[in-house]
Amino acid sequence: MENLKTYTFDEAYKASLNYFAGDELAARVWVNKYAMKDSYGNIYECSPEDMHHRLANEIARIEKKYENPMSAEEIFSLLDHFRYIIPAGSPMTGIGNDHQVASLSNCFVIGIEGDADSYGAIMRLDEEQVQLMKRRGGVGHDLSQIRPKGTPVNNSALTSTGLVPFMERYSNSTREVAQDGRRGALMLSVSIKHPDSEAFIDAKMTEGKVTGANVSVKIDDEFMKAAVADKPYTQKFPIDSSNPLVEKQISAKKLWGKIVHNAWKSAEPGVLFWDTIIRESIPDCYADLGFKTVSTNPCGEIPLCPYDSCRLLSVNLYSYVENPFTKEAKFNFELFKKHVAKAQRIMDDIIDLELEKIDLIMSKIENDPQCDDIKHAEYHLWEKIKSKSSKGRRTGVGITAEGDMIAAMGLRYGTQEATDFSVDVHRTLALAAYRSSVEMAKERGAFEIFSAEREANNPFILRIKEADPQLYEDMLKYGRRNIACLTIAPTGTTSLMTQTTSGIEPVFMPVYKRRRKVNPNDADVHVDFVDEVGDSFEEYIVYHRKFLEWMRVNGIDTEKRYTQEEIDALVAQSPYYKATANDVDWLMKVRMQGAIQKWVDHSISVTVNLPNDVDEALVNKLYVEAWRSGCKGCTIYRDGSRSGVMIAVSKKDKKKADKEKEVAKDMPVKPLHNVVEVRPKELECDVVRFQNNKEKWVAFVGLLDGYPYEIFTGLQDDEEGIALPKTVTKGKIIKQIEPDGKRRYDFQFENKRGYKTTVEGL
């Protein structure tokens, strides 16, 4: 290992920049997140080509254990340049990496069977959550087994505190765990049947609370029907008991209104339509054998049973469009089917690689110097995970670039025509993946507990039977290698490297404008803007890569300097017109998710992006439509409703806002966003006070056109901190230039008597 060649960051970045054809963000993300490194920060790969050879060689090693193995060269050709098949982050980082003892799984769910509301059970889950996060996994678990607030307990407390304090405990644990420079990811869920579900729903509305977790409510059909019809609904604990300890009737409509309001206000909670999830779940055909689904992974695309895990992989849909953005555009279904079959095979190989990694983790635990009492809990955790992984062999084959595929085919995202085409693609994917799993069952054996009889009435299996009777007959005869196969994940950083839209989502913005500082004396410099201190800036256009391809295909000059009006006109001519994240037809997007969901055996991670000025009635309408359309879950994000999230810069005019509230079909083109890189001398400012690890802090949020532009933070009420009257909530941040040319930022506010006070040097 000491003989391996190492590279500096600059060497790897330069090679990767060339690999990604000048895409700085893609190059930087790859070097920072996915290049093979050791714990000292040494980099052992120069570009993604090195990584793909590493992955191909390891997967080919597993292939040799079985009949008809794929070669390393064939596997590399599928991975190269992120063109066809892209493993998710954990497999990309971990496969063949001997420098880290970490899992290849992207996500886990944990839970305790039986009585799990004791302090011991709650603490056990806390420990297991941390142990998994330190191995790079995201974690989900359900809180429905914790007894509600005020119920008797047999300890000195006399009554239960309810589940909200434990939400905060699990959230804080997440924030403590570092995963290669990022904190852990956590999903907390609770059943709407639980008497504390309202407190759960409100928990994140208090600033600074439960900041380390996503939260989702598991909603059953009975509740949805009661909410729509304004009928009472019964909550109880235990939630599935015929003889509950606690039982109460509530107004379903009122509680539903709170869910809608909170989602509108803060983008949480998400909703999980639990009856749909369980009804459609193939693993739940084996619920009595330990495969009862209890929660989801942090992004919601994989519902899981306790101690099961999943590895993810995406197929780049754009790469199967021949002659993209032309009248001759055609989707190559035959090549797509071949590659999906190989993707499913690669995913099964990655399970074997994960089982090897688990053995290494368990060996490390055994050899750690701690006493056996301390090590036992972690060791037993990985024993349970290994057992579930080998019994079910669950996979997560998904897609990315749906939005670009639709545009390349000359369709508009959010139309019925585009939805119908997408459903055809996902039906093809599902049948090809399941056919591959059946073929592997012939060669490698079915998953350990396969039973055709148990699955006979599962809706997803019945759709396969109707669509491909021969596949169904073969599955009855040979079984299936994997208990479940499919998902659609967000693919955030993955899509940066494929240089496409992410997951099932439309493009965020096809084109936007930026400014960069230039020397006006340099040759070929075009000065578009000079700030108040005399610095010169040049404006330049940033194109979404596939929008740029549309321009090239249609003979549009990509080097020309376009005006704002010309860019708007170009967007209006393109298939990305009215098809960005914020201006698609939102109801059609939800219906599209529901239609595709019928061909995805796990779930789909989708966010419906809404403008800031939509009302709660629209959120309600979208959630109800998601339930009726067969979605397994739904997440709403209203622009500006959550701090720390990228938001749109421009405001929409009043006429368009009125149309959006009615979910209008015919909306004007969204104007080009101008990303301002030169701040004005003064910015309006909001003052936010918060706690960080029990310390009091203050944040100054500079606003440009009413939206966050910059933020300064510091300790308050401390000798070296920032002292402000508690009544101060607004002011100005002023950029100052000192005589020596140094810049500083001052905060200025008015006191109750109208006098201005300035705090220098934020």
For each of these PLM feature ranges, what is it?
Residues 1-104, 256-265, 624, 628, ...:
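Acidic/polar, glycine-rich intrinsically disordered N-terminal extensions of enzymes
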Residues 160-164, 174-262, 269, 323, ...:
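Conserved catalytic alpha/beta cores of large enzymes that bind or transform nucleotide phosphates
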Residues 471-477, 648-703:
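Short, Gly/Pro- and small/polar-rich lid/capping loops
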Residues 36, 58-65, 78-155, 163-166, ...:
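Function-dense linear segments that define catalytic or interfacial modules
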Residues 75-76, 236-239, 339-386, 390, ...:
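Internal maturation/activation junctions in enzymes
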Residues 60-113, 120, 234-262, 266-271, ...:
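Gly/Pro-rich turn-and-neighbor structural signature
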Residues 24, 300-302, 354, 461, ...:
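Catalytic alpha/beta core of large soluble enzyme barrels
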